[in-house]
Regions:
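Short boundary segments that mark the start of a structured unit
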Residues: 1-414
């Protein structure tokens, strides 16, 4: 009788069969004992099976080293997988990925590496994707999921892969290039009537942003000012990810301003916490100049009411007490109130006409007096009317769109 010791190795070999057979019967000097032997049934085939539950002695330890960092758009330096026991040359290391702040869109996953001539190492690299998004540092993990042959059969009975992974951080470039830049354009109305809401402005991105991203808007003014519109400060990226629309309300004021131009432009694309969505923006064409025009036919809301108070009487040769012109809406300080005169029993020879008054620091009042002429004629009571004919600037341009002058006069008796 005899026994045979089997070798407990690490390889997943399946059932393995060997035959042990009698080759002779000899003495201690190797001389045959018998003249002849019938050995037809002097053998046994025995099958060696792997353990059902592999132990530590059946386990291959796998480790991985590799880069902690990579710049977006670059290929990583080498990752190296190392085995504690050799595998056949050409065996396949299968790789798996998990993501924390990164995603599968940020890299091109390398799915396998090949065991080299030494039988214990495999190297590979990973390509990162250079996108346009300002994502900050993004972390992914690459790990070993198995060691297999070309038919996907395991090479080893058991693997310890507790240290067979590397976490790598992808960082945005310090200086984004053209490939990292999103082009932003804007279209919108060239004109709007004062008091109306504009038609739509549309912001368009060359690359999609998350739905709900915020387009921040900025304004500059040439002949218009911030008082002429209600600034829309942001627009929201819609379901298509590349467009946002908005309108702007104009203010219907009383001023005769002529055509007024403002510019609305894109200042950024951000998330709800004001973090940039993209690494870089080209906003050179992300603006629209819009001209605000006064209404052709001003309405009551565009009309300034002007009133005048003053002396009912003056003695010939005296200077009147003050006349006061009052506006319902302010005019710029220094604006000119133009005055007109008409006569009933008096005439232009009876007074020295004051032709204008100046709006004071309060913006709504102007005062003036009128000199009467002391002549030799016994004329009795003479009546003249002074009235407001306009409110203008230093170049005689109207300040307001329309005036209500129904009560902008005083009749004075000399």
């Amino acid at each position: 009788t005899f026994t045979i010791d089997t070798v407990d190795d690490v390889y997943a070999e399946g059932d393995e069969v060997f035959r042990v057979s009698v080759s002779g019967i000899v003495d201690s000097d190797s001389n045959p004992i018998f003249e002849a032997l019938n050995l037809d049934n002097a053998f046994v085939d025995t099958t060696i099976s792997d353990e059902t539950d592999p132990g530590p002695e059946d386990t291959v330890t796998v480790t991985m080293t590799g880069p902690a960092n990579v710049v977006e758009g670059d290929t990583t330096t080498d990752y190296t997988v190392t085995l504690s026991d050799p595998a056949p040359v050409g065996s396949i290391v299968t790789l798996a990925y998990s993501y924390t702040t990164a995603s599968g869109d940020d890299i091109t996953e390398t799915t396998q590496a090949i065991i080299g001539a030494d039988g214990v190492t495999a190297t590979f690299t990973i390509d990162t994707v250079d996108d346009v998004y300002a994502e900050g540092d993004e972390v992914f993990r690459v790990s070993v999921s198995g060691i297999v042959d070309g038919d996907s059969n395991p090479i080893f009975e058991a693997l310890d892969v507790s240290n067979a992974f590397v976490d790598t951080t992808i960082s945005d470039e310090t200086d984004p290039g053209p490939e990292d830049t999103v082009t932003v354009t804007m279209t919108g109305p060239a004109n709007v009537v004062e008091g109306d809401t504009t038609t739509d402005y549309t912001v368009t991105l060359s690359d999609p942003a998350p739905v709900g991203s915020i387009v921040t808007l900025a304004y500059s003014y040439t002949t218009a000012s911030g008082d002429d519109i209600t600034e829309t400060t942001q627009a929201i990226i819609g379901a298509d990810g590349v467009t946002a629309t908005f309108t702007i309300d104009t203010v219907d004021d009383v001023y005769a301003e002529g055509d007024e131009v403002f510019r609305v432009s894109v200042s950024g694309i951000v998330d709800g916490d004001s973090n940039p969505i993209f690494e870089a923006l080209d906003v050179s064409n992300a603006f629209v100049d819009t001209t605000i025009s006064d209404e052709t036919d001003p309405g009551p809301e565009d009309t300034v009411t002007v009133t005048m108070t003053g002396p009912a009487n003056v003695v010939e040769g005296d200077i009147t007490t003050e006349y006061t012109v009052t506006l319902s809406d302010p005019a710029p300080v220094g604006s000119i109130v133009t005055l007109a005169y008409s006569y009933t029993t008096a005439s232009g020879d009876d007074i020295t006409e004051t032709t204008q008054a100046i709006i004071g620091v309060d913006g709504v009042t102007a005062t003036f007096t009128i000199d009467t002429v002391d002549d030799v004629y016994a004329e009795g009571d003479e009546v003249f009317r002074v009235s407001v004919s306009g409110i203008v600037d230093g170049d005689s341009n109207p300040i307001f769109e329309a005036l209500n002058l129904d009560n902008a006069f005083v009749d004075t008796t000399i």
